[in-house]
Each structure stands twice: as structure tokens, then as C-alpha cells.
Amino acid sequence: MEQTFSVTTAQRLDTFLATLLNLSRVKVAKLIVDGLVSVNGKKITKNGWLVQPEDRVHVNWSEELFEKVPVEVQPYDFPLDILYEDEQIMVVNKPNGLISHPTSFNESESLLGAALFHCNHQPVFLVHRLDRDTSGVIMLAKNQSSLLHLQKQLQQRVMKRYYLALVHFPLDSLSGTISAPLERVGNNKVMWKVGNSSNKAKNAFTKFTVLNQNEKAALIKCELLTGRTHQIRVHLQFIKHPVYNDPLYGLKSEQATEYGQYLHAQQISFIHPTLNKEMGFEAQLDKTFSDKLDNLNLKIANSLYALFQ
């Protein structure tokens, strides 16, 4: 089915199509990434492309494109940045753009698949997940016993996870805790929002500390006290400091690039499931994130690295 629409107000391409086609952002993203959308005759593959008044948007799609397939982890020959590995666990620095787990929309190239390939098809399990465009430390277990041990640490907040987030605008408070329950946005299977105390909303808590800021932006450290989907991104949007380049929760006026949100899982600490000793690991920023900080004149002062210890 081919359709053409005229734009009346400036907005993101994915938002524009999601509204007109009554599709989720995930489905719209698939249309765009698969090259089925053009603007003024030019094929566009960036979800965050900003369309302007009088632009003509053409899309060629059908519901059959979104038929789900059974999710099965396929070995994926992909080089992993392994921070630590033994017979029980793996700690990996996940790159931006790689999904943690395969999806039901024929997306099989995942970090879990890469770990499966690395382990010669021996069982391996995700202890937690990171969003596709969130880079940084992620943990995997090599057996059910270690998996349960580590997931229990998550639930009891023994495991500590620290993130770096680049956000818009300077913050008035240099530290604090965001306490705001999260729930889905209507029937949308992708987006979340701050809800109320209804049964649908789940309690969520995020601690933050400003590491550096100027008149345009701030680099902040976030600690997850709970682990809800998109928690940091939604919480920072809620306090009106959205993450830079966030395709779902960023500024509407911002034309997001393929890199996605500037959010990085910087550090993790936990008790090893069999050695019974505390361990901690840090993942370095990639060049794109680091260059962005340079462009905005934002760096972490050496004295502030202690905040991650």
C-alpha cells in the first residue's frame, strides 16, 4: 500500500508517521530503516529526521511487514569488547546500535547472539539489558545458578549500576533523587511515561549528580535504584533535561542522528556468584560520545571520578 502525506507543522518523521498510520514507533522505525519512506522524493533512513511544512512524505508499507517471528537467539559473529570473563560470568562493553536480545521483528544480530558465538554455542544468559543505542557495561551469566545469584543482587540493590548521561540545559540542583512511577503510554508497546499511583504505574527511582555543565548542556552521573524500561531517559525528560539525541524522549526540535541517545553505562559493581568477592568494572566512552563532550566543552574532572567509586 502506497500513501503520500503533506506536512503542515515541523516535527520528527517517526512521530509524523506514527500518528497518521496509527502505528507504534517500533513499526514506524522499521519502515524508515528498511528504506520504505521518502521525503520530497529522497529516501530517508533516520527516524529523527525533521520534516518541514509543505514537505511530501511517501511511504510504501503493509501489515505483513510486521508479522512477528518466534524469538530465537542465533549465534552472531561479532567482535566483543570483553572487560572480564571466567567460567561463571562475562562483563562486556556493549557498543551503541547493537540490541541486547533478538526481537520478534527479525532482528537477530544481538549482543546475546555474539556472546553465544564467543562461547562456542554454550548456554549464556543476559543478567540485565541495555537499550539498543545505550552503550556500556552489560553482564551475562554462563549458567542458571550464576544468573539467579546476580539477578537477586539486582532486586536487592546489591548490584550497583552507574550511567553517564549528556542532557540538555544546566540543572539547578547539583544532585538529587528522581522519584516518579513509570507506565506505558496508552497501548504503545515502546514508549513509557511518568504515571500516577495507579496499579499500572511501577515505582522508579534514579539518583543523579552533575559532573560538569555549562549554559547549553550538562554531563551527569545517574545511579539506577530500580531497573524499569527506559527509566533514566523518561526520568530526565520528566525533569525537563532530556538526553541529547534521544529519538523517543528528546527535544521535539532536535533532529536525532543514527547514533541515538547519549547515554552510557559507565560502571557496575557486584558480588561474584562463586568467588563471593566484590568486583567492579568500567567501560570507556566511544569516540562519538567523547567527541560530543569535546564539542560542548564538557569533560569529567579527574577529581569527580571518585563519585563512581
Swiss-Prot record:
Domain S4 RNA-binding, residue spans: 11-87
Active site: 131
Gene Ontology MF terms: RNA binding; rRNA pseudouridine synthase activity
CDD domains (UniProt xref): PseudoU_synth_RluA_like, S4
EC number(s) stated in the UniProt entry for this protein: 5.4.99.-
Disulfide bonds listed in the record: none
InterPro entries: PsdUridine_synth_cat_dom_sf, PsdUridine_synth_RluA-like_CS, PsdUridine_synth_RluC/D, PsdUridine_synth_RsuA/RluA, RluA_PseudoU_synthase, S4_RNA-bd, S4_RNA-bd_sf
Keyword annotations from UniProtKB, A to Z: Isomerase, RNA-binding
Catalytic reactions on record: a uridine in RNA = a pseudouridine in RNA
GO BP, sorted A to Z: enzyme-directed rRNA pseudouridine synthesis
PANTHER family linked: MITOCHONDRIAL RNA PSEUDOURIDINE SYNTHASE, RIBOSOMAL LARGE SUBUNIT PSEUDOURIDINE SYNTHASE D
Similarity comment: family membership: Belongs to the pseudouridine synthase RluA family.
Protein name (database record): Uncharacterized RNA pseudouridine synthase MG209 homolog
